């Protein structure tokens, strides 16, 4: 019997825990069951109390104190410890039925999704046939305010694509906190970010305004040392790097974003629908036969 899950990922501040809370609330309102797992060993406050919390196994504070690691190293240590104690996950999940949506709230340290093989190993363990057999979807959140800074947006998008390639499971990319960009970005302009391409850099109004203000030509003076420029991150080399990153993302043609506003119930419902489609949740549910109360009453009479 298959189980179903969504692993919620993204950089720090993307609104992962807030989205998990909104999703659980929506599921409860629609009489669907959720099993909430917190895998962030540094998280302390939750709107919905986790059904399973990694801090019951190991906390980031304990890892840092006992092993003498920093925050990022401590986080990696916590996940390595988790991978050595996977029975802790199995015992909690193996009794769940296919009616549950397992929601896994992940930490925001990006190296987990890009640099180390721990998460791919964890996803493989959860999804392999056997006692768990979880049909997993990866849900990657990127804060919508990133669209204001296009270099930052493409950097975040590159991380999302890296996670897609690493995990090799159905993947949904989300622009979260849409309520924060209302009035800042026109709907027509925002639509272009849903399928990123190099053209976004060509039409960057911030870069265009800067060039007019500084009276620059198409390229900066590369003879200047980086420390002689007002800002190192706005030179010709930086622009070429951004263009290379954007070109790489466009060449893969893998990234499409969906919009999320957790304050809007319809928006949360739409994201849940995408998740259900990815993991084929409804196809696995037993068909429910209609109950004809009148016929039942006649039969009983």
UniProtKB/Swiss-Prot annotation:
It comes from the Eukaryota. SUPFAM superfamilies: P-loop containing nucleoside triphosphate hydrolases. GTP binds at residues 13-18, 176-179. Residues 212-232 are annotated as: Disordered. Heterodimers with GPN1 or GPN2. Binds to RNA polymerase II (RNAPII). It comes from Gibberella zeae (strain ATCC MYA-4620 / CBS 123657 / FGSC 9075 / NRRL 31084 / PH-1). The lineage of its organism: Eukaryota, Fungi, Dikarya, Ascomycota, Pezizomycotina. The record marks 72 as: Stabilizes the phosphate intermediate. InterPro entries: Gpn, Gpn3, P-loop_NTPase. Belongs to the GPN-loop GTPase family. GO terms for molecular function: GTP binding; GTPase activity. This is GPN-loop GTPase 3. Small GTPase required for proper nuclear import of RNA polymerase II and III (RNAPII and RNAPIII). May act at an RNAP assembly step prior to nuclear import. Residues 223-232 have a biased composition (Basic and acidic residues). CDD domains: GPN3 (cd17872). A motif (Gly-Pro-Asn (GPN)-loop) lies at residues 70-72. Keywords: GTP-binding, Hydrolase, Nucleotide-binding.
């Amino acid at each position: 019997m298959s189980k179903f899950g969504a692993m919620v990922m993204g950089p720090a501040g993307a609104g992962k825990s807030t989205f998990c809370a909104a999703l659980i609330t929506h599921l409860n309102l629609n009489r669907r069951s959720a099993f909430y797992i917190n895998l962030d060993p540094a998280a302390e406050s939750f709107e919905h109390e986790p059904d399973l919390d990694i801090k019951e196994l190991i906390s980031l504070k304990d890892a840092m104190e006992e092993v003498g690691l920093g925050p990022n190293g401590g986080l990696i240590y916590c996940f390595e410890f988790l991978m050595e104690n996977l029975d802790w996950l199995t015992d909690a999940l193996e009794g769940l039925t296919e009616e549950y949506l397992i929601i896994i709230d992940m930490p925001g340290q990006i190296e987990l999704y890009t640099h180390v093989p721990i998460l791919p190993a964890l996803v493989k363990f959860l999804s392999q046939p056997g006692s768990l057999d979880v049909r997993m979807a990866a849900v990657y959140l990127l804060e919508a305010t990133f669209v204001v800074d296009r270099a930052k947006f493409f950097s975040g998008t590159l991380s999302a694509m890296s996670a897609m390639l690493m995990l090799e499971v159905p993947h949904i990319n989300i622009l979260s906190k849409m309520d924060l960009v209302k009035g800042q970005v026109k709907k027509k302009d925002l639509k272009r970010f849903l399928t990123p391409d190099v053209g976004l850099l060509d039409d960057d109004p911030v870069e265009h305004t800067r060039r007019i203000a500084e009276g620059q030509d198409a390229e900066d003076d590369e003879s200047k040392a980086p420390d002689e420029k007002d800002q190192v991150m706005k030179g010709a080399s930086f622009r070429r790097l951004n263009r290379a990153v954007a070109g790489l993302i466009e060449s893969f043609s893998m990234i499409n974003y969906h919009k999320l506003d957790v304050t809007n119930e319809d928006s949360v419902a739409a994201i849940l629908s995408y998740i259900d489609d990815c993991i084929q949740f409804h196809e696995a549910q037993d068909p429910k036969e209609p109950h004809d109360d009148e016929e039942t009453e006649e039969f009983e009479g």
